[in-house]
């Protein structure tokens, strides 16, 4: 029994990458997953890979005093786990956010080396009793944070919009993702819907091939994201909540 407990403590924790084309509700899905997993007692660090739309001011727009930043941590001379932790904003008791801060962008800090990015994910994985959810960008070729997250992740949730944009993105990125380092065949590929126009689910599934499921459009989730309350408010939508629960169970089943 004691040996099992020691092994459990030594196990590295999960990294989950939420990746996909623009407009596929990556951020909404990442935050919804974080909230659900936190409600089950899992500690979560949300990593925002986007430097053009930093996650922190989106997820917690009323926070004005926190001066920490992923960029600040990555550019620090004394980069270590303590420096990472100092730059995490605790949005709830169980969910912390590590991202660029308001009015920051890729030019705010010095260019970050690949070695530093590698070290970041290694340090995060070793954080005790914590899983990591990375809100990725759509550009795996240009974003080091996104590329390393997708390579390193135990679970990659790929979101594709049920339209021409999603189909074209899928065809464009597949040659890159076919590289062995991305374990593309293990991706959990989800088709996401919007309310803009009627979408042909059957035709798009046939065109895209391997699709694990769909994420319905949820007006309340969109509203709460816009209000910056998605981490703290429960969404009253049974179909949407069932989908998020199913995704979370895929992530948590090996723990």
Where are the predicted features?
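Pre-Walker A adenine-sensing motif
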Residues: 1-10
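P-loop/Walker-type NTP enzyme "switch/lid" segment
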Residues: 46-126, 226
């Amino acid at each position: 029994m004691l040996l099992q407990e020691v092994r459990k403590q030594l196990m590295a924790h999960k990294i989950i990458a939420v990746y996909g084309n623009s407009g596929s509700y990556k951020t909404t899905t990442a935050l919804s997953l974080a909230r659900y997993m936190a409600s089950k007692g899992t500690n979560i660090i949300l990593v925002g890979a986007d430097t053009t739309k930093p996650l922190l001011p989106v997820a917690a727009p009323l926070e004005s005093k926190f001066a920490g930043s992923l960029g600040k941590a990555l550019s620090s001379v004394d980069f270590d786990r303590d420096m990472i932790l100092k730059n995490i904003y605790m949005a709830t008791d169980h969910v912390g956010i590590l991202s660029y801060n308001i009015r920051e962008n890729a030019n705010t800090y010095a260019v970050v080396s690949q070695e530093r990015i590698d070290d970041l994910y290694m340090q995060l994985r070793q954080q005790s009793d914590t899983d990591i959810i990375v809100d990725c960008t759509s550009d795996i070729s240009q974003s080091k944070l996104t590329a390393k997250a997708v390579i390193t992740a135990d679970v990659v949730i790929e979101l594709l919009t049920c339209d021409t944009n999603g189909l074209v993105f899928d065809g464009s990125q597949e040659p890159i993702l076919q590289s062995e380092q991305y374990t593309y065949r293990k991706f959990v590929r989800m088709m996401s819907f919007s309310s803009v126009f009627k979408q042909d689910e059957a035709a798009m599934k046939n065109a895209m091939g391997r699709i694990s499921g769909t994420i319905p459009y949820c007006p309340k989730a969109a509203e709460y994201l816009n209000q910056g309350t998605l981490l703290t408010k429960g969404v009253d939508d049974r179909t949407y909540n069932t989908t998020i629960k199913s995704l979370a169970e895929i992530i948590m089943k090996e723990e």
